[in-house]
Amino acid sequence: GTGITEEFEEVPVQSRGFGILDVGYR
């Protein structure tokens, strides 16, 4: 991926719904 979504592309599509919120989770 690119930019801020770099890490989110690694996780399942289901988790992508969290988007930026996942940053605090991880």
Swiss-Prot record:
One GO location term (cellular component): chloroplast thylakoid lumen
Domain notes: A 7-bladed beta-propeller torus, about 54 by 55 Angstroms, with a depth of about 25 Angstroms and a central pore.
Record's subcellular location: Plastid, Chloroplast thylakoid lumen
Protein origin, superkingdom: Eukaryota
Protein name listed in UniProt: Photosystem II stability/assembly factor HCF136, chloroplastic
UniProt entry keywords in alphabetical sequence: Chloroplast, Photosynthesis, Photosystem II, Plastid, Thylakoid
Family: Belongs to the Ycf48 family.
The species this protein was found in: Populus euphratica
Coiled coil: none
Main location: plastid
